[in-house]
Amino acid sequence: MKLKSKPKRSFGLLAAFIIAAMVGQTATAQENLPTGREAVEIQGGVYPASYFPNTEILGTDELRITALGTGMPNQTKMAVSISFFVELGNGDKFLFDIGTGSTGNLFSLRPDFSKVDKVFFSHLHVDHVGDFMGLHVGGWLSGRYDPLRIFGPSGATPELGTKAYVENMKKAYAWDLQTREGALPDAGAKLDVTEFDYMQDNEIVYQENGVTIRSWPAIHSLDGSVSYSLEWNGLKYVFGGDTYPNKWYVKHAAGADLASHEAFLPPKALATYFGWDLGQATYVSTRIHTEPAAFGKVMSAVKPRHALGYHSVLSPENYQAIVEGVRTTYDGPLTLARDLIVINVTKDYIVVRDASVDDYALPPSVTKAYVKAPRSDDKSPSDKVNAGKWDGYTPPAMPDKPTDN
């Protein structure tokens, strides 16, 4: 893909080196951008300093995690709400949460949306599911011709669970869906919801194509929050969602290749950021979330190959406060995630760098299957509304429909 505007977040070799030194990764990013940005398979752990979407072929034993959103409910331009995009060398793609604002970063990667059809909710706070509608409709517009599959926990009562959330949201944008039927593949409008017991302990919620995803309870606000692990081809990624430090995460994340867990602002920094009194900030940071020193204790117990913290706004002062807190209790490999950070994981390497994306990324090309997928009749306004069309304008003739090759 030829970039049409100055790419953002391309910090070059120096930034890649700084990240490598900070986290203690086993391979450093090198300035060897593939010629012409053609898709190539990386050899010997020598990666370009920045990740350019669709220029690298994942190895058969490689996964790539992109942080689409790492911030707070009050999103900023540089830190939208929580979402992680996981791509495997077998072609499978998974979303863990889809918080408000995160779809913009997803679409900037220009993935094959026919394969972006699975999203796993950790819980139903808006900063974790707020872009659900955008994912459903935007992915449908961009190449998904099958139902969007949603996996998520039950709640303490039926109306607080994932199934009720999805059903109610679909009712809320029923008008939108009906206007697009006919122009877009019919099946892409559908939603396939799998709700599971939030208290199940490391049980399988998804198992297909050699991929196993398990869930266990998280402790956050109300009953109905979970964490996940994804295992494939001898690699393990863990997504914590939002949670107070808990025994389930420590047990089931143990030894993960990449363990992600919130590293929330410490109380004083949180009080300053929101203008709260210290009591309120302390309660939120240390009773509902996981503050940095507690994150460090969790990671010291889990001992992952690499620890990934998120759920903050990494202004210089906040970044310093979080790092200092974590390093009082954990001295292992660490990255504090910012939006569009990319982590490649193999059995030999873990490489951390930034994505370089176009501010005006075009939608990805769609597959032939998408073009040929069944569609119902186009929708239009009623006769009484159409009667109001202005006779001062005549639209151009419709082109002939393309023929199958």
List the predicted regions and their residue ranges:
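Juxtamembrane cytosolic interface motif at the C-terminal end of transmembrane helices
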Residues: 24-27
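Bacterial N-terminal signal peptides that target proteins for export
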Residues: 2-14
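Bacterial N-terminal signal peptides
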Residues: 12-22
